A protein has these predicted regions:
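Beta-strand-dominated extracellular/periplasmic modules and repeats
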Residues: 1-147
Length: 147
């Protein structure tokens, strides 16, 4: 098992108001860089104790939270967590969160495709120790804006 990460934040509209009831989904590879996907090579080596995905409805204040693993790199990609948000009004956003300052980000084709540094900041997780959680756990807060 990898390092525990507590990922939380809010789903907001373009005016900064919370989006109630948005469906938030995340998925990622395990601590060995293996996805739970039928076409994933090396799938027999996957950590069967790690689900690899989660989904929840954002609360009235737009809040969501997941207990997952700190993402790891795999061939051609820097550490990241995929996410998708669907709102009751039909808005859909699919993107990825990256670890801020990760040296591999500059070699990741998807990350490099985001040329505006201000937009990159919106998807860069700042990881910090998670006080009051399990020993060694990390935490980050990532608000998601859908418009």
């Amino acid at each position: 098992m990898g390092m525990v990460l507590h990922l939380e934040g809010r789903v907001l509209d373009l005016n900064g108001k919370p989006v109630d009831g948005a469906l938030v989904e995340i998925w990622q590879c395990d601590a060995q860089g293996i996805y739970d996907h039928p076409r994933q090579s090396g799938r027999d080596k996957r950590d069967s104790a790690f689900q690899g995905y989660g989904r929840m409805l954002a609360k009235t204040d737009g809040r969501y939270s997941f207990r997952t693993l700190k993402p790891v790199a795999y061939a051609g990609r820097s550490p990241h967590i995929h996410f998708k948000v669907a709102t009751a009004t039909g808005r859909l956003l699919t993107s990825q969160f990256y670890i801020g300052g990760e040296p591999g980000n500059d070699r990741d084709g998807v990350f490099r495709g985001i040329r505006d540094p201000r937009q990159r900041e919106l998807i860069e997780m700042r990881l910090a120790p998670a006080p009051g959680k399990e020993a060694g756990a990390l935490a980050t807060t990532m608000d998601i804006v859908v418009g």
